[in-house]
Swiss-Prot record:
CC per GO annotation: chromosome, centromeric region; nucleus
Record PANTHER family: CENTROMERE PROTEIN N (PTHR46790:SF1)
One GO-annotated biological process of the protein: chromosome segregation
Family under the similarity heading: Belongs to the CENP-N/CHL4 family.
Protein name, as recorded: Centromere protein N
């Protein structure tokens, strides 16, 4: 076994939480149960990592075996990476061909290796998802296994979830995906998160959809609250019910997908109607700013704003539309009115 492969395997083992080490090694499947029983899990973790490398050397592990371990690690801890959603499309209406995994892998490798031979490509299926691992190299350097790109493709959908993709490699990977999946074009969606499953919930519409209602106010029956102590006056009962009703109508009642960030880029012209007149920004350049919202669970935080009394109900569509528009990055510009001094926000 090459020394650099041994070092790569060792680094993966060192990244594993101590309690998860044996679980990951069993899922890897390269070492037998009897071989795993010889391992002694103890601190420092370097001792365990060295023992794993020794077993791998005895079995002459290859880069494909090391890549398989990297697959298992990144699948189990996918939330350690930032994932971006890409969407593919076809120029003309046509029936989707039956997915042939072998043909997909062949065409994918062929497309990339036609441009660069010094690239290692591996595939692994996890349920309905096909995971692709690409380690990029140059003419003078071997593929960098420590900065591999991962792409997760669901064959029955036009969506691909990608992480670790540099700008220089993006055109080549996108071209390979389009060719192998028999689509015409691909584009990046304005949707990112560390929670891969939540991104899937959003683009596949798997999360709890809010109900639609033609009533702007809740039913009277919903306003009746059991009064435990008749001496207590529930002054805000009706308003609280209205807020909760609008919140349920906007976000639903089930769990929401997990996103950590939403950003809004604003471009607008400041204008004055006083004697100074004209634009307040020099050179007719628009004023630009970026507003970012962050939270460990942003959508749940937004849903709780109105019930907590922090914001008025209903919540602005700029915030509530995130899961339905499948994006958490927006650019807001102004609509040009008939009069120079008039402007208003535009839809996004």
């Amino acid at each position: 076994m090459d020394e650099w492969i041994a070092e790569f395997i060792k680094r993966i083992i060192l990244k594993l939480p101590f309690s998860q080490t044996m679980t990951i090694l069993k899922a890897w499947g390269f070492l037998t149960d009897s071989e795993l029983q010889t391992l002694t899990l103890r601190y420092p973790k370097d001792i365990t990592a060295t023992e794993v490398v020794r077993l791998c050397e005895a079995k002459n592990a290859t880069i494909d075996h090391a890549a398989a371990l990297d697959f298992v690690f990144n699948h189990a801890f996918s939330n350690k990476k930032l994932w971006t959603v890409y969407q593919m499309s076809k120029t003309s209406e046509s029936e989707n061909d039956l997915f042939d995994a072998s043909e997909f892998k062949l065409q994918f490798k062929k497309s990339i290796h036609a441009v660069s031979k010094n690239v290692t490509i591996n595939f692994k299926e996890f349920g309905e998802a096909l995971w692709i691992r690409i380690a990029w190299g140059t003419h003078n350097t071997r593929p960098n296994q420590y900065k591999a790109t991962f792409a997760v493709y669901h064959s029955q959908t036009p969506h691909v979830f990608i992480t670790g993709l540099g700008k220089a490699c993006r055109p080549l990977l996108c071209q390979a995906l389009v060719i192998a999946s028999k689509y015409s074009q691909i584009q990046e969606m304005e949707l990112k998160s560390r929670c891969l499953e939540s991104l899937k919930d959003i683009v596949f519409k798997r999360f709890n959809q809010p109900f639609s209602s033609h009533h702007s106010r809740p039913h009277e029956k919903a306003l009746t609250q059991k009064i435990v102590d008749p001496r207590v006056t529930y002054e805000n009962m009706r308003e609280k019910e209205r807020v909760h009703h609008l919140t349920r109508e906007t976000f639903g009642e089930g769990p929401l997908p997990k996103l950590e960030l939403a950003s809004y880029k604003l471009e607008t012209m400041f204008r004055a109607e006083s004697i100074m007149g004209g634009n307040l920004t020099a050179g007719n350049e628009p004023f630009r700013c970026v507003v970012k919202f962050s939270s460990p669970h942003l959508l749940e935080a937004i849903r709780s704003l109105a019930p907590a009394g922090i914001a008025e109900a209903p919540i602005s569509t700029l915030l509530s539309c995130i899961p339905h528009k499948a994006r958490n990055s927006f650019k807001i510009t102004e609509k040009r009115g008939l009069h120079p001094a008039s402007s208003q926000p535009t839809n996004f």
